[in-house]
Amino acid sequence: MEKKLLREGPYADFFSQGVQVGNVLTMAGQIAVDDNGNTPDDLKSQMIMCYENILKILDHFGGTLENVIDETWFVTDIDECMENVSEIFAEREKIYGCKPEVSQTLIGVNALVQPNLKIEIKCIAHIEK
């Protein structure tokens, strides 16, 4: 089995940001931390930054958001997410450029890797070789 890997960032020695086998690309969960280590305070801004990181991975493997087939969102405050779901999903549609045609799972968690994080997004994409 041939694997194509993307290892970068501060944890490159520990895991890959993306792994492609055949036409399937799995991505590590993406968090809202920029290249300088900064994280926005609010959920919507963190979601936007997660997608910015997802776009970088997709681009590395020759894909776009059109290739995403599945998303899993991990959020630390499910109530906050659901109270703002219309605004958050409207912003998500802007990022995708359309209503996303993906399966999606939303999971509430007690914590993420850093205490100020509110969301982590993990995606699977199908990219033709």
Where are these regions (language model features)?
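N-terminal presequence-like segments and the immediate start of the first folded domain
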Residues: M1-I69, V75-K129
